[in-house]
Regions:
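A short glycine-centered flexible hinge/capping loop motif at secondary-structure junctions
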Residues: 19, 23, 27, 31-35, ...
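Transmembrane alpha-helix boundary and packing residues in multipass membrane permease domains
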Residues: 28, 57-62, 71, 75, ...
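Amphipathic cytosolic juxtamembrane alpha-helices at the membrane-cytosol interface
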Residues: 1-10, 14, 34-42, 92, ...
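Generic hydrophobic transmembrane alpha-helix motif, especially the helices
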Residues: 18-93, 127
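Hydrophobic alpha-helical transmembrane segments in multi-pass membrane proteins
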Residues: 8-23, 50-58, 120, 124-141, ...
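C-terminal transmembrane helix and the adjacent membrane-cytosol boundary/short C-terminal tail
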Residues: 61-64, 68, 75-78, 124-134, ...
Length: 208
């Protein structure tokens, strides 16, 4: 279980970081530039959100094959759209603020405004979203491993351990129960952490 935690948590962290980085950049561009840039990025995000992320990840994995690297790529490519929409919405609001207008008036470059002035104000929401996306990635890996297209031996993720233990479900049920319980505990822990951070970082909830 401890060894499998290394693989499962890595799968939770790395694709989440990559997908959120992609979504953040695209969301900033869509919200700040508007026009055709906004239209193209948001329509692409709508297409991604129209299908379950696990289904899209399955298509990518069936195309590329199993393995940890391909899991990283698949989960990174299919989970950026939600982040992009959130960052875009905040960018649309922030770019009308006085500090952004002041930066524009003195000739600050657009990319500098986006990453030095707007992005820091999006960080509280991104931190909360990050903690909530990690368990989603862990569950996606477990589902892909259950279907035989996720982590492959000799890797030992919790998802793969649970799948390989199902052969002995009646004689040695702990082989599947233990990694499944580990997944459940970690997912719940990250969800509670995300809820707590949202309560702390959301100024509206603070006022309440």
């Amino acid at each position: 279980i401890i060894f499998g935690a290394r693989i499962s948590l890595t799968i939770g962290l790395v694709p989440t970081l990559i997908s959120m980085a992609i979504g953040t950049v695209l969301g900033l561009c869509a919200g700040f530039y508007g026009g055709k840039t906004d239209f193209i990025i948001m329509r692409l995000a709508d297409v991604m959100l129209a299908f379950p992320s696990l289904l899209l990840a399955m298509v990518v994995m069936y195309t590329m094959g199993g393995g940890l690297i391909n899991i990283f790529i698949a989960l990174s490519l299919v989970n950026w759209a939600g982040t992009a929409r959130i960052v875009r919405a905040q960018t649309l609001s922030l770019k009308e603020k006085e500090f952004v207008e002041a930066a524009k008036s003195i000739g600050v470059k657009k990319w500098t405004i986006m990453f030095r002035h707007i992005l820091p104000n999006c960080l509280p929401s991104l931190i909360v979203l990050f903690t909530l996306n990690i368990p989603s990635a862990i569950l996606s890996e477990a589902s892909l491993s259950f279907l035989g297209i996720g982590a492959q031996p000799p890797s030992a993720s919790w998802g793969l351990m649970a799948v390989r233990g199902k052969k002995y479900l009646f004689s040695e049920p702990w082989l599947s129960i233990a990694p499944s319980a580990a997944i459940m505990i970690v997912v719940m822990a990250f969800n509670f952490l995300g809820d707590g951070l949202r309560d702390v970082l959301d100024p509206y909830l603070k006022e309440q």
